[in-house]
Every structure is written in C-alpha cells, then in structure tokens.
C-alpha cells in the first residue's frame, strides 16, 4: 500500500522491504502510512528516520487518491499475465484477459465489487468476435442490408448497455469506498452527525441494491439480445439454404448458374414449368394409347397371318418360322433333292437291268429253242428266279422311298437317323448292283463256254416259254408302275417348288412383321423411358413438396419465436420506462445530498489546522512498527529452517519406503519364478481329475485373496504418500513421490501380467487329464508356497503398520511445531495490535478530519458527474425505446409477410399433391387396361388353338398360353392391390393433414376436429360402396367365394347423416376425439374386409378382375 507505490505494472520484490507485507489485512485506515515527499506514486520511499513532515495539501491529495481507488497490493496483481478463462465475470477483482492495446483500470477498492474497464471499441459480438459475413453470393441484397442494419443496431445497443453498466459500477464502488472510509471517523469524533451518516448509509445501501438489480436486468437484456442475434443469424442461414436450393433447381433445369431468389416469380415459373410437364405427360399418354392400339391391331393381323400359316403348313406344324425354321426348311429341300436324285439313279439302274434282262431272255429264248432239258437249264431258271426276287425287293425299296418322300413332305424334315439309314440302304443297293453285274458277266462267260450245250437245252426251254411270257407280262406291268412313279415324282417336285415359293413369301412377310415389331418395340421402349423420366420428375416434385413442408414448419416455428421476441421487447420497454423513473428519483435525492454535503464541508474546513503536530508522532510509531516487522521476519526464517530439517527427515522416510518397495519387487520376482515353475509343470502334466479342479479353485481363491491384500497394501501406500505430501512442500519430494507412484503402477502392471499368465496356466491345467500323482505332489508344493507368501504378506502388513505409526507420530510432531509457531506469531500479532491501537488512538482525529474534508470535495465532484451521467442514461434509454418500437414494427411486418408466404406455399403444396395423386391413378389405370387387353388377347389365342385340328402341340401351346394368362392375372391382381393401397394412402394423407393441422395448433377447437370426422365418414361410405360392388359381383358369379368372410359391424350400420352431424356439433372436444378414433378403427376394419374379398376373388375366379377394376373406378 504505502510501499507498493500504487503501480500495477512492474512490481519488484526488492522494493517491498520497507512496505507492507501482502499477508497483512487491508484496512482503509492504513491508506496513507508511507508515501514520498512529493505525493507521487512510484519513486523513493521515505525511510524510517527521515523526519520529514507532509504538508496539508499532500495529505489531502493522498487521502483523496486512496479514497477513490482504494489500496492495491502486490498480491492483487501477481497474476496480471496469467491466463484466465474467457467470459468469466465475477464481482471481485478483474481477472479477464484483454487484447493488446486496451487499458485495464481498477474501478473500486471494495473487496467484493470490482470490474475491468475495457474500451467500448474492443467489445465484440457473441464470443468476443463476429463471424465474417461471407454470404454475399447467396444472400440477396435486400436481406443482406436488413441483416447488416439489425446487427449494427444490436451492436450499438450492446455498447450503450455496457457503458451504462460501467457507469453504474463506478457509482457503486465510489459509494462503498466513501462509506467504508467515513464510518470509523464518524463513530469516534463526529457523534452529532452519526445519525445523519447512518441514514445516508441506509439510503446508499438501498440505492446499491437497486443498482445491482438494474445491473442484473441489463445483463439479462444483454443475454436476450445475444439470443435474438443468434435467432436472426439462424434465420439468415435458413434463407441462404433456401436460396441455394432454388438456385440448384433452376441450374439443373436450364443449365445457367443464376442465383435464385425466393420471390413470387420463382413460384410462378415453377408452376408454369409444372403445367408444361403435365401437358407433355398428357401428350405422351395419348401417344402411348395410340401406339398400344396400333400394337393391338398389328397383333391381330399377325395372329390372322399365323392362323393362315398354320392352315397352309399343317404338315410342318409350326406357328412361325424363325431363323431355325428357315434352316430346317433348307435342310428339308436338300434332303428332298437328294431323295429325287437317288430315285432317278435307281430308275436308271432299273432300266439298265431291265434291258440286260430282256437281252438275256432273248438269248435264252434263242438258245433254249433247240437245247435239251438238263440240270443246267434248271440252274438258269433258279438264277432267273433269284433275279426276279431281287427285282421285287428293289421295287419294294422304291415303294419305301416313295413313302419316305411322302413322310418328308408331311413331316417337313428327315431326322439324322433316317438319313443314316438311307445312306446304308444306298450302299446296300450299290453293292448289290455290283454283285449282280459280276454275276451277269460270269453267266455270259458260262454261256459262251457252253454254247454247244444250248441246243440240247432248247427242247427243255419250250416248257419254260409260258413262264417267260408271264415274266414279260410282269415286266410290262412294272414298266407302267415306273411311269406312274415318275409322274408322281414330277407332281411332288411341282408341289415342293410351290411350297418353297409360298414359304419364301411367308418369310418375307415375317421379316416385314419382325421389322415392324422391332420398330414398335423401340417406340414402346422410348415411351417407357419417357414414363420413367416422368416418374423421376414426380419423385422430384414429391421431394420438393416435402422440402416445402419442412420449410413451412420451420417458418411457423420462426413466427412463434418472433411473437415471443415481440412480447419480450415489450416487456423490455416497460422495464426501461421504470428504470428512467427510478433514475429521475435518484437524481432528485442526489441533489438534496449535495446541498447537505456542501454545508458540512464548510463546517469541517475549520478543523484542518490541528493536523501538523500529529504527523511527527505518527512517523515515530511507524518506525517502531518497522522494527517489529524485521523481528517477525527473523522468526519466520528460523521457522523455515526447522521445516527444512523436517523435510530432510521425511526424505529419509521416503528412502525407507523405497527399500520396502524394492523388497516387494523381489517378492514379485519370486512369484514370477514360481509361475514359470508352474508353466513347466503344466507342460509336463497330461491329465487332471475333479479333486485337482477343487484344489485349483482353492488356489484361485487364495490368489484372489492375495490380490485383495495387494490392493489393500497399495491403498495404504497411497494413504502414506498422501500424508507425506501434506507434510511436504518442496518440489524434490513431490518428484520422488511421483517416482514411487510410477513404480507402484509398474508393480500393478506386473501383477496383472502375472495374473493373466496364471489364468492361462489354469486353463492348461484344466485340459490336462493324466498323471494324477505328479499333479498332487505339485499342488502340495504350490500350497506350501502360498503359505510362505501369506506369511510374507503378513510381515509386510506389520511393517506397513509400523511405518504408518511412525509417519503419524512425525505428522503430530510437525503439527505441534506449527501450533507453537502459530502461538508465538499470535502473541507477536497481539502485541503489534496493541501498539497499533495506541498509535491509531493518536492518529484518529487528524486522519479522520482530513479524510472527511477530502471526501466531501470528491463527493461534490462525483455527484455532479453522476447527475450528468444519469441524464445521459435517460436520453440513451429513450433512444433505445424508440429503436425497440421501430424493431417491433419491422418484426410485425415480417410476420405478416411470412404468414402470406406460408399460405401460398400451403396452396402450392396441396396442388402438387393432388396432381401427384392424379398422375399415379392414371398410371395405374393404364397398367390395368394393358393387362386386361393382354388377358383378353390370350383368351382369344386359347380359343383359336382349341378350335384347331392338331392335338398334341396345340395342347402344349394352350397350356403355355394359360400359364401366361395366369401370370398376367397375378399382375392384374397386384395392380388392383396397388390401387387399393393408393386409395388407402390418400386417405391416410388426408387424415395426416388433418392431424398435422391439429398438431400445429396446440389445442384444436371442436370445429377443427369435426372436419376430419366428416372426411372419415366420406371415406367410410366409399369403402361401403366398393364392398357392395364386390359382394354383388361374387354373388352373381359364385356365392361360395364369400364363404368364411363376415363383414365388420360398421358395414351394417346405417346412420342418419344430418342427425349425426347435429350430434357432432353438440359434442365436447374429448367426445369428438373418441369419435375420431372410432371412425379410424371402422375404416381400418372395412379396408381389411375389402382386401380379404379381393384375395378370395383372385384365388377363385380371377377372370372377373376387370369388373373389379370397373367397381374401383365407380367407387373412386
């Protein structure tokens, strides 16, 4: 205080020796004990025996300085450069960090209220900084300007409120310093004015409480303003996200990276684009219908041509000629040509053989005319008979070939096996013809060699002439048959050429049909692609609808928050008005106090002349005090030396503890060695029994007990360390203790490792099941080791208890020494207090008179400044009120605009949902119509095939068509179920809308509940109508379809609509909620019943699904 030189910056401990110790209590009475001769604040301090006296002006200035700012010790500013957490505001000394270049001034001397004065320019926004505004590219200019304006207004309001806080804090601290400095003097020397001072003090205390409340209210307002700023930032962020969404949407459609603003033009553009897409979808649907009609007509023409092909090619028995069919046709024609060539070859062979036969017969006729009958003639006759038999076999082969040709023409193609058989027959015929030629040559040679004998055989050949005539007749008949066969072959070749031409014509027509079908298929694929694109567009629209709904919810929440903010700001305006009234009353009270203080200052100026004589006595008393302080310092040095000796003793104790820890580590190493022995024993073991398992369990229990004892030992060691830490204060001892703790943790790790190995060994021991005797011996050895370890643990416990007792004794001795030191220091302090009291009794009169005069002058100046400050505050509060009113009006305008935009978005949402439903219903209708057309086409094909003549293949085709028809019927059933689901989803969406509208309002009114009830009733009537259509269809077709299905109770109820609506108007909100739940249950039951009827229809008679679809259209 008097030695600290009133400086906060550089504080040197060397300049503290003549000054006051920081440990001494702060007293306002010792505010001007030691100072320099010039009244400065830093410089050379006056020594104990300087003998200089201070003038009255210096004393008054010193007292004024000490009264305004209070004493500042070195202990108060030892942590000037230390780091403190951000935004911690306490009602004590300021400990916050300030940026470079900002002065920090202490604003009061009270130990309870202090603050740091920060320049208003350094006050930042939120966490002492504003985020950089980097949304210029995404945020529109109007929104950016509005945001900047609001942020600037809020910053100015924050600065004004903080300035008010600083001024109020200064007033509070000044008042407290005045009260604390003037109360003691009034008690002793100014008894007539004691009552007045007490009244003033009470007034000041009440004003201080009022100011504190005002300060708290201003803090709350600051917090609320920060909350509003954050809300506005969130709103700006949401607006930016909306703009980015619209920008992305517009860039994906047009390819131009333009910035989309949320305006009515964007909504109109979106709506126009949506209408254009709907028109395109309608045109696409029309073209799809036209293409489907064209496809159906093409299918009918194709079916007609197929039927004609079937009629023309019944021999081929195939519906259509694909690429494989054309190849088969080529093979068939090739086989027919080969068969014709084979027939021509056989005919030529027959002609040659007939010529040879005729030649032979003529020769035989000539030679047998005169030849006698002998055995040779008989041989010749047998040869001729053999030739006749061969000719007949060849004729049979010809007939077989003709039959094969007819089979080829009827069946269309010869199989590979038949072809191989034909080749074999051809080879047989060729070999036979060669054999015959060889025989004829041999006969010629025999005839030439035996010409002499022919004459003898002529007589015998006369009898054979008749037979030869018969052979001739047979040969003529065979010639006629050959001519007939040739004519048949020519007709067959002509028919084959005609069929070839017809097949080529049919092929050309089929290729044309295939080309047209390919074109139609490409068109259908293109239409499907366009349908998929439209479905993706619909999905995008649904996503946009969901986003709009989310935006609607967020904007509704923002509207609610804005309403709350409006209410809060209105409350703030009321509070500010009350503040202004209170400040005006305070100004009046301050003016009255100023007048009374001026009168008292005039009366006190006469008492300032008697202060010079008391200064000399004060200086002598101060010199005596300095001597006593030096004695106390010497005693403190002695106490420190004694404490150092105690610390050395503790170090020795720590060494002993280290030795004990090393002993414990040796025990651990022994345990590890025993564990290694256990491992070796476990590897040598091979079997184990139940007795060994029980002994192992006992060993585990013993190990757990050891663990618990180790943990107890560690806890005891920790307690001993904590006791030693309490007794020690040097850094070396703390380092050694930390080293011991690390060793203890290492010991724990080693014990945990040992425990893990023990567990692994136990598992190995459980697997071993042989060699019981060896294991018993080793278990006994382990038990002995456990007993030894238990003994060691007990010894360690005993040693630890002895060490604990020693440490407790040492702590008690240290406490006794500290108590003795405290007693001696207390005695010295008592003697010092007595001397101080004596000195103070001499000083009181002079000091208090000087203080009172100086204080009165300062009070006058401060009251004037407080009055001007209060006037400024009143003006600033009025300006703030006007700004708050303007903000209220702007927020109201924003509310109205946001509500309008919300209404527009809701209408847009409902339109988009209705269009989506319509598109989905149209798509489902188109699919159902296409399926019905396909089913009818399959039915027509089945009827045509059943009317055809061939049986086997037509039955297979009918079965295939029926399978396709069943598949189409299943698809139709699936589509009807999808349509029913769509109706149910539409109903649920409507119900969700109504429930969501009810949820947005916190407590829905009865009128809001009646509307969804009426919608539920309409849906119920539609479901009843639909179920009625289905039941009539089932009764008309087959009543057994509805066997086992019972309609719900709600289906048979027929209520009067008008009476029911009148009853709804009379019901309360709870009754309406119950009625709503009942209606939902009834609709769910009716929906389930309708689904069950549809399932029965699909199972029993799927052919009436078309009538079901018509019933759906009527009900919808």
UniProtKB/Swiss-Prot annotation:
Molecular function terms, GO-annotated: cadherin binding; PDZ domain binding; small GTPase binding; structural constituent of presynaptic active zone
Modified positions (N6-acetyllysine) in chain numbering: 10
Positions bearing Phosphothreonine: 38, 1046
FIP-RBD domain: residues covered: 1046-1108
Cellular component GO terms held in the UniProt record: anchoring junction; centrosome; ciliary basal body; cytoplasm; Golgi membrane; IkappaB kinase complex; podosome; presynaptic active zone cytoplasmic component
Complexes and interactors: Part of a complex with CHUK, IKBKB and IKBKG. Interacts with CHUK, IKBKB and IKBKG. The interaction with IKBKG is independent of CHUK and IKBKB. Interacts with NFKBIA. Isoform 4 interacts with PPFIA1, and through its C-terminus with the PDZ domains of RIMS1 and RIMS2. Interacts with ERC2/CAST1. Interacts with the GTB-bound forms of RAB6A isoform 1 and isoform 2 and with RAB6B. The interaction was strongest with RAB6B, followed by RAB6A isoform 2 and weakest with RAB6A isoform 1. Interacts with SDCCAG8.
Its biological purpose: Regulatory subunit of the IKK complex. Probably recruits IkappaBalpha/NFKBIA to the complex. May be involved in the organization of the cytomatrix at the nerve terminals active zone (CAZ) which regulates neurotransmitter release. May be involved in vesicle trafficking at the CAZ. May be involved in Rab-6 regulated endosomes to Golgi transport.
Full protein name: ELKS/Rab6-interacting/CAST family member 1
This protein's encoding gene: ERC1
């Amino acid at each position: 205080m008097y030695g600290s030189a009133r400086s906060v910056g550089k504080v040197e401990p060397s300049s503290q020796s003549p000054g006051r110790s920081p440990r001494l209590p702060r007293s306002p009475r010792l505010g001007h004990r030691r100072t320099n001769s010039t009244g400065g604040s830093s410089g050379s301090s006056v020594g104990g025996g300087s003998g200089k006296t201070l003038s009255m002006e210096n004393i008054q200035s010193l007292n004024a300085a000490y009264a305004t700012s209070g004493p500042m010790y070195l202990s108060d500013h030892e942590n000037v450069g230390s780091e403190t957490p951000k935004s911690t505001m306490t009602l004590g000394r300021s400990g916050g960090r300030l940026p470079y270049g900002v002065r920090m001034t202490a604003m009061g001397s009270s130990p309870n209220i202090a603050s740091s004065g920060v320049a208003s320019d350094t006050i930042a926004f939120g966490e002492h900084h504003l985020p950089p505004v980097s949304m210029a590219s995404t945020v529109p200019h109007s929104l950016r300007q509005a945001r900047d304006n609001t942020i600037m207004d809020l910053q100015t309001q924050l600065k004004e409120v903080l300035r008010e806080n600083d001024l109020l804090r200064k007033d509070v601290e000044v008042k407290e310093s005045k009260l604390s400095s003037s109360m003691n003097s009034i008690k002793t020397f100014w008894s007539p004015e004691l009552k007045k001072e007490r009244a003033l003090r009470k007034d000041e205390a009440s004003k201080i409480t009022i100011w504190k409340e005002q300060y708290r209210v201003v803090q709350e307002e600051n917090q609320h303003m920060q909350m509003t700023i954050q809300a506005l930032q969130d709103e700006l962020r949401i607006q930016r996200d909306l703009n980015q969404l619209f920008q992305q949407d517009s860039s994906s459609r047009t390819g131009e990276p333009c910035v989309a603003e949320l305006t009515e033009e964007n909504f109109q553009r979106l709506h126009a684009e949506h209408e254009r897409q709907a028109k395109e979808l309608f045109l696409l649907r029309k073209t799809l219908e036209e293409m489907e009609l064209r496809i159906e007509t093409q299918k009918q023409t194709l079916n007609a041509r197929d039927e004609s092909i079937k009629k023309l090619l019944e021999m081929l028995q195939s519906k259509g000629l694909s690429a494989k069919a054309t190849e088969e046709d080529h093979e068939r024609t090739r086989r027919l040509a080969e068969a014709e060539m084979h027939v021509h070859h056989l005919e030529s062979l027959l002609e040659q053989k007939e010529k040879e036969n005729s030649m032979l017969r003529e020769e035989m006729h000539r030679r047998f005319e005169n030849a006698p009958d002998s055995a040779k003639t008989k041989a010749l006759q047998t040869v001729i008979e053999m030739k006749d038999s061969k000719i007949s076999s060849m004729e049979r082969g010809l007939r077989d070939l003709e039959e094969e040709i007819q089979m080829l023409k009827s069946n269309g193609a010869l199989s590979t096996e038949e072809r191989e058989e034909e080749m074999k027959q051809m080879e047989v015929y060729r070999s036979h013809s060669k054999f015959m030629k060889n025989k004829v040559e041999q006969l010629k040679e025999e005839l030439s060699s035996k010409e002499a004998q022919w004459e003898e055989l002529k007589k015998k050949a006369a009898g054979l002439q008749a037979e030869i005539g018969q052979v001739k007749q047979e040969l003529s008949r065979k010639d006629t048959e050959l001519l007939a066969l040739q004519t048949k072959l020519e007709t067959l070749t002509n028919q084959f050429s005609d069929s070839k031409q017809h097949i080529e014509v049919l092929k050309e027509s089929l290729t044309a049909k295939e080309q047209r079908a390919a074109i139609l298929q490409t068109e259908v694929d293109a239409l499907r692609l366009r349908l998929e694109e439209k479905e993706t567009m619909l999905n995008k629209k649904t996503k946009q609808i969901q986003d709009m709904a989310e935006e609607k919810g967020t904007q509704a929440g923002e509207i609610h928050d804005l309403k709350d903010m409006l209410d809060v700001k209105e409350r703030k305006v009321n509070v500010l008005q009350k503040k202004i009234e209170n400040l005006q009353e305070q100004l009046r009270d301050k003016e009255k106090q100023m007048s009374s203080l001026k009168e008292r200052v005039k009366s006190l100026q006469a008492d300032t002349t008697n202060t010079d004589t008391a200064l000399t006595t004060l200086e002598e008393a101060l010199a005596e005090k300095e001597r006593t302080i030096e004695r106390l310092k010497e005693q403190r040095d002695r106490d420190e030396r004694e404490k150092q000796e105690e610390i050395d003793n503790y170090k020795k104790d720590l060494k002993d503890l280290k030795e004990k820890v090393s002993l414990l580590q040796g025990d651990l190493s022994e345990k590890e060695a025993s564990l290694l022995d256990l491992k070796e024993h476990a590897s040598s073991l091979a079997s184990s029994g139940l007795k060994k398992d029980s002994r192992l369990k006992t060993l585990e229990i013993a190990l757990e007990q050891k663990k618990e004892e180790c943990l107890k030992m560690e806890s005891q060691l920790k307690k001993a360390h904590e006791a030693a830490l309490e007794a020690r204060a040097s850094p070396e001892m703390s380092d050694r203790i930390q080293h011991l703790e690390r060793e203890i943790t290492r010991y724990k790790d080693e014990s945990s490792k040992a425990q893990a190995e023990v567990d692994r060994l136990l598992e190995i021991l459980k697997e071993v099941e042989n060699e019981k005797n060896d294991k018993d011996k080793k278990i006994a050895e382990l038990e002995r080791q456990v007993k030894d370890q238990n003994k060691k643990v007990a010894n360690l416990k005993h040693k630890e208890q002895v060490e604990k007792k020693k440490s407790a004794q040492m702590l008690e001795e240290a406490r006794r020494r500290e108590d003795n030191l405290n007693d001696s220091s207390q005695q010295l302090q008592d003697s010092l207090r007595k001397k101080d009291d004596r000195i103070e009794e001499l000083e009181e009169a002079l000091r208090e008179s000087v203080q009172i005069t100086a204080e009165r002058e300062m009070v006058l100046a401060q009251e004037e400044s407080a009055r001007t400050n209060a006037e400024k505050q009143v003006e600033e509060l009025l300006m703030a009120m006007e700004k708050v009113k303007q903000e209220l009006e702007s927020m109201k305008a924003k509310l109205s605009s946001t509500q309008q935009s919300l209404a527009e978005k809701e209408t847009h949402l409902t339109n988009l949902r209705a269009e989506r439903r319509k598109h989905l219903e149209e798509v489902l209708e188109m699919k159902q119509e296409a399926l019905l057309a396909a089913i009818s086409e399959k039915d027509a094909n089945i009827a045509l095939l059943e009317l055809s003549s061939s049986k086997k293949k037509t039955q297979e085709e009918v079965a295939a068509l029926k399978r396709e028809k069943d598949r189409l019927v299943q698809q139709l059933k699936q589509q009807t179920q999808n349509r029913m689901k769509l109706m149910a989803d539409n109903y649920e969406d409507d119900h969700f809308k109504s429930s969501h509208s009810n949820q947005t309002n916190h407590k829905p009114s009865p009128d809001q509940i009646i509307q969804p009830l009426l919608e539920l009733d309409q849906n119920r009537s539609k479901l009843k109508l639909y179920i009625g259509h289905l039941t009539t269809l089932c009764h008309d077709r087959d009543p057994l379809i509805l066997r086992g299905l019972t309609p719900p109770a709600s289906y048979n109820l027929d209520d009067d609509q008008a009476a029911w609506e009148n009853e709804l108007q009379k019901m309360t909100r709870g009754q309406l909620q119950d009625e709503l739940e009942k209606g939902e249950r009834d609709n769910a039951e009716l929906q389930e019943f309708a689904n069950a009827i549809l399932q029965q229809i699909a199972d029993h008679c799927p052919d009436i699904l078309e009538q079901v679809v018509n019933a759906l259209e009527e009900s919808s």
